[in-house]
UniProtKB/Swiss-Prot annotation:
Function: Serine/threonine protein kinase which acts as a downstream effector of the second messenger cGMP. Controls the release of Ca(2+) from intracellular stores by regulating phosphoinositide biosynthesis. Ca(2+) signals are essential for merozoite and sporozoite invasion and egress from host hepatocytes and erythrocytes, and, in the mosquito vector, for gametocyte activation, and ookinete and sporozoite motility. During the host liver stage, regulates the initial invasion of host hepatocytes by sporozoites by regulating sporozoite motility and microneme exocytosis.
Stretches for region cNMP-binding domain 3: 299-402
UniProt main location, coarse: cytoplasm
Binding site for 3',5'-cyclic GMP 1: K117, G126, E127, A129, R136, S137
Membrane-topology annotation of the record: Peripheral membrane protein
Binding site for ATP: I551, G552, R553, G554, T555, F556, G557, I558, V559, K574
Region (cNMP-binding domain 2): 180-279
GO molecular function: ATP binding; cAMP-dependent protein kinase activity; cGMP binding; cGMP-dependent protein kinase activity; metal ion binding
Region Autoinhibitory segment, annotated ranges: 1-33
Assembly with partners or alone: Monomer.
UniProt source species: Plasmodium berghei (strain Anka)
Stored SMART domains: cNMP, S_TKc
Protein name per its UniProtKB record: cGMP-dependent protein kinase
Residues the record marks as active site: D668
């Protein structure tokens, strides 16, 4: 749809909200910190003090999810402050850093110099300061002599981090000790650790009862518990012991009663939550064993990961008793490969034992490679066992045919072309068509495959042999098996820049012609590839750029539309003020932004061409995106239809999935950070909040309305926070307003609504698939959030909301976008002269250069 065909729905709530700004990750030393130093007194906490502090913390928004031990630990970090009547504690409009609990006296609250209420013992104030260094909304003075307990934000959040890390590491060590989890991967064990729920039991309280059907595994973290069978005491369990592991695998009665001997704390994992996070545990365990065994096979390690997973899914799993002939040389017909999942089996050839296979071991490479060969071996169980059988039909279903060589050949071609930008984002259908179009040709030693100066029309991959690259009669380099050359000939009519000569007899190459390629790749995708390659080929110097317009403005500077005079290619130049970076302590973040942006290579993510710097600015030269912000587009479109929401959310999902695969969490997903290109497709921009994440992060960063609960709570988070933002965006697309805190500007109230508010939908939203997906994306527990299980983004893509959506056509730019701008649209459009004075003022500011940007 073109933008001149759209009549905005002016009364629609989505037109009403202002653009939202992100919170930056930094800590300032505030005036409040200095003030508190003058009122600090050392004092031990009495029992009644601990009671008062704990009661107040339990009512605190950020502390609402903490357990008793965590509350007690935080209480220990509270400091004692003394104030005289009339003393100011906090001042309206200034940045806050402390949270206070009144120990004695009265404290008066003023808003705009008007007294609005008086607080007394047990009351608390400054809660927002525990989350972020936001401005105080009121002034508070001591109405009488009084005392306060207080804690500084950095201390509070550092304590939360320490407690969370300690708890996670302890739970993870317990998980490692449970034998049923032995065959799980590190990622799977971490997911189970995150799913642990702490349960506390009083002395004499029954944890599990003999004969009851259970679905929970318990691991003792603290305390002791007694085991009884038929009312007879059997033994005492202590810290690190676990029980109920079979409840995760089987629906059977408990074999014993276990009663807490003293105050006891357990980490518990229930089967239902485990199924959400990981899937059926037994299936996952067997699948892991099969996948690992297949990866050890000389044959199967050459097929794709997807094909490996398909084989593991389609393998036939069977149970066998002890001393049973599982496979007999005279009776085997279709089985080609076996994997031992449980137990031991013995392998025979010509009635002679040739080895014993245990769990995780496999056999059958020779029969997979030559499927017409008659099975000569016999397999006999030595004990009760479970075996995975891969048959001819399994191989045919997963590999497309029974020819394993053809499948390996196909995968080699695919792995090669997927490394090249020109082919990387072809749809599966396009990729298959391209690979099927490859033909084989042979050359002898000295033959020219490509002649320098000739206009080419073929792309080559070396199947076997070697070639040398020669330019101006000078040998440049040698290429061998699986190397490629000539790919530019598929897009451009230009002379070959070098000759390629065979250095061996019987050189074998795969090739595809330009005419075939253009039948497969056409329209928007071809135009996109041409522009992308042209942009990347161009070498740009700062002195060659001519500023035409100012097209954007942000916290740290401006974005210019610039022209590269030698080539007439236009770019966007983001100019970042070093002064602003230093003032806001963003030195590390700007370096990280450069690193992440430079590595990104995805059609739905802004492409960085190169960076520059001088004494006052950093410069990011990127592709120019001319279609305006998604923020404005959804206001032109009004309420999005299902197909429109699918297009935009699907595009965002593909971009974020690319980042998560590289362990990058974006942390500021919102329509303001998404541009539309001239074809109407999305471009994710602004990586100022992004981070390479290993383990968990604790920084409060992002735009409040789009923040996931785990970011606010400060107990650690991972890439799951971006998936929460999917839910916020989808809600905004189809409902109009934001799901939480839509009418709020006060950050504490926004956070309160995110953590405790009810998710409701307007009456005009009736699409149940949309509603259900939003509910699952906006699940406050990350481990229960769709897209956060071991299946990852697959669960979202296969959700019923996307049932009629073609992901292949989206990636291949074959879908019609909801909005295509007929004219260039930018966030701002300012004449250069209007901003020259600002640049001059900045240029006259001295920067304390400590070489922190030496690698920029």
């Amino acid at each position: 749809m073109d933008d001149d065909e759209i009549i905005p729905k002016k009364n629609h709530p989505s037109n009403e909200r202002n653009k939202k700004k992100a919170i930056l990750s930094h800590e300032d030393f505030t005036g409040e910190d200095s003030l508190m130093e003058n009122h600090l007194e050392l004092r031990d906490k009495l029992t009644e003090d601990i009671v008062t502090i704990k009661a107040s913390l339990k009512n605190n928004l950020v502390c609402s999810t903490l357990n008793e031990n965590e509350i007690l630990a935080l209480s220990n970090y509270m400091q004692f402050f003394v104030f005289k009547s009339g003393d100011m504690v906090i001042k309206q409009g200034e940045k806050g850093s402390y949270f206070f609990i009144i120990n004695s006296g009265k404290f008066d609250v003023y808003v705009n110099d008007k007294k609005v209420k008086t607080l007394t013992k047990g009351s608390s104030f400054g809660e927002a300061a525990l989350i972020h260094n936001t401005q105080r909304s009121a002034t508070i003075k001591a109405g009488t002599n009084g005392t306060l307990w207080g804690v500084q934000r950095s201390t509070f959040r550092a304590t939360l981090k320490q407690l969370s890390n300690r708890n996670f590491n302890e739970n993870r060590s317990f998980i490692d000790s449970v034998s049923v989890f032995d065959m799980l991967t590190e990622a799977q064990k971490n997911m189970i650790t995150n799913a642990c729920v702490i349960q506390n039991f009083k002395p004499g309280e029954t944890i599990v009862k003999q004969g009851d059907y259970g679905d929970v595994l318990y691991i003792l973290k603290d305390g002791k518990a007694t085991v009884y069978i038929n009312d007879e005491e059997i033994r005492v369990l202590e810290k690190g012991s676990y029980f109920g592991e079979r409840a995760l695998l089987y629906d059977e009665p408990r074999s014993a009663t276990i009663i807490a001997k003293e105050v006891t704390s357990c980490a518990s994992i229930c089967r239902k939550l485990l199924n959400v996070v990981l899937g059926n545990l037994q299936v996952v365990l067997f699948r892991n064993i099969m996948t690992e065994a297949l990866q050890q096979s000389e044959i199967f390690k050459q097929i794709s990961p997807d094909q490996l997973n398909d084989l593991a899914d389609t393998a036939i799993v069977r149970d066998y008793p002890a001393n049973y002939n599982i496979l007999h040389k005279d009776k085997i017909k279709s089985v080609k490969y076996i994997i031992v999942l449980e137990g031991k089996v013995e392998l025979f050839l010509d009635d002679e034992s040739i080895g014993i296979l245990t769990r995780g071991k496999s056999f059958g490479d020779q029969y997979v490679l030559n499927q017409k060969q008659k099975f000569k071996h016999t397999l006999k169980s030595l004990e009760v066992c479970k075996i995975a059988l891969i048959t001819e039909s399994c191989l045919a279903d997963c590999l497309g045919n029974n020819n394993i060589d053809a499948s390996i050949d196909y995968n080699n071609k695919k792995s090669i072309i997927k490394k090249m930008y020109i082919f990387r984002y072809l749809t599966d259908k396009q990729c298959n068509l391209l690979i099927e179009a490859f033909k084989t040709t042979r050359y002898e030693e000295g033959d020219y495959i490509i002649q320098e100066g000739e206009v080419g029309s073929r792309f080559y991959i070396i199947k076997a042999g070697e070639v040398e690259i020669v330019k101006n009669n000078k040998r440049l380099r040698t290429l061998g098996k699986n190397d490629y050359f000539g790919e530019r000939a598929l897009i451009y009519d230009e002379p070959r820049t070098a000759s390629v000569i065979s250095t061996v007899n019987n050189l074998e190459c795969w090739y595809v012609d330009k005419s075939v390629f253009l039948q497969i790749i056409e329209g928007p995708m071809l135009a996109h590839l041409e522009e992308r390659i042209k942009m990347q080929d161009t070498k740009v110097e700062m002195s060659e750029l001519l500023t035409e317009r100012i097209i954007g403005r942000g916290t740290f500077g401006i974005v210019k539309l610039v022209l590269h005079e030698p080539t007439k290619i236009r770019y966007a130049l983001k100019c970042v003020s070093k002064k602003s970076i230093i003032e806001l302590n963003q030195q590390n973040n700007i370096k990280l932004e450069r690193e992440i942006t430079a590595e990104n290579d995805h059609p739905f993510i802004i492409r960085l061409v190169r960076t520059f710097k001088d004494s006052k600015y950093f410069y990011f030269l990127t592709e120019l995106v001319t279609g305006g912000e998604l923020y404005d587009a959804i206001r032109k479109l009004g309420l999005l239809s299902r197909s429109q929401a699918q297009f935009y959310l699907g595009s965002i999902i593909l971009a974020i999935e690319y980042l998560h695969e590289r362990s990058i969490v974006y942390r500021d997903l919102k329509p303001e950070n998404i541009l539309l290109d001239k074809q109407g497709y999305v471009k994710l921009i602004d990586f100022g909040c992004a981070k390479k994440i290993h383990g968990r992060s604790y920084t409060l960063v992002g735009t409040p309305h789009y923040m996931a609960p785990e970011v606010i709570l400060g107990k650690g988070y991972g890439c799951t926070v971006d998936i929460w933002a999917f839910g916020v965006c989808l809600y905004e697309f189809i409902c109009g307003p934001l799901p939480f805190g839509n009418d709020q500007e006060d950050q504490l109230e926004i956070f309160r609504d995110i953590l405790t508010g009810q998710l409701t939908f307007p009456d005009y939203v009736t699409d149940t698939d949309s509603i259900n997906l939003i509910k699952r994306l906006l699940c406050r527990l990350p481990q229960g959030r769709i897209g956060c299980s071991i299946n990852g983004f697959k669960d979202i893509k296969e959700n019923s909301f996307f049932a009629d959506f073609d992901w292949d056509r989206l990636a291949g730019r074959l879908l019609e976008p909801p909005l295509i701008s007929k004219s260039e649209t930018y966030a701002e459009d300012i004449d250069v002269k209007q901003i020259e004075q600002e640049e001059e003022d900045n240029a006259n500011t001295e920067i304390d250069d400590e070489n922190w940007d030496i690698d920029f």
